[in-house]
């Protein structure tokens, strides 16, 4: 059943997500970097005070990745040229911390993660990245074999233990995790 909820955000919605653990938690990131969260299925919204996150790409937007393991953990990504390209919240977006160690100033188009959140993948303007939670750092995945170009999308496919990245003009690139990850 479709039910339109009226709410005036401070800008155009650039990304929207629902918690996979409890879909009554909803998240919005606007094109001007404002983050909003709802705890009641979108009936009421709160803005993160004193926070401006990454803005989105003019055509592609920004990205929100709610954790599938920890209720309240939310990752956001977007333009990181004058601020961090990725942030994380542990409390549904009431406040955020930068998450940029090892990640250069770039534009993050999409985030995805392993089911346990131990690895966060980022499709960026300058290549594919992975954040290792146990090291609290981002690492470039391209090495010598991946195309050197923009990576627009990423999805983690748990059935085959693979992060699948989509590039701009060079096809699909799979990063397969072995049993030691």
Question: For the regions a protein language model found, what residue spans apply to each?
Answer:
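Extracellular glycan-interacting surfaces
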Residues: 1-181
């Amino acid at each position: 059943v479709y039910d339109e909820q009226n709410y005036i955000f401070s800008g155009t919605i650039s990304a929207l997500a629902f918690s996979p653990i409890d879909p009554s938690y909803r998240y919005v990131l606007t094109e001007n970097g404002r983050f909003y969260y709802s705890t009641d299925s979108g009936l009421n919204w709160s803005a993160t005070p004193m926070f401006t996150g990454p803005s989105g790409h003019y055509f592609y937007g920004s990205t929100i990745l709610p954790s599938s393991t920890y209720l309240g953990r939310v990752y956001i990504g977007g333009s990181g040229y004058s601020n961090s390209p990725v942030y994380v919240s542990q409390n549904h977006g009431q406040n955020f911390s930068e998450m940029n160690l090892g990640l250069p100033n770039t534009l993050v188009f999409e985030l995805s993660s392993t089911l346990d959140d131990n690895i966060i993948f980022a499709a960026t303007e300058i290549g594919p990245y992975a954040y290792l939670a146990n090291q609290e750092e981002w690492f470039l995945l391209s090495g010598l074999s991946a195309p050197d170009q923009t990576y627009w999308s990423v999805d983690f496919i748990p059935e085959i233990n693979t992060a699948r990245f989509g590039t701009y003009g060079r096809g699909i690139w799979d990063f397969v995790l072995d049993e030691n990850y």
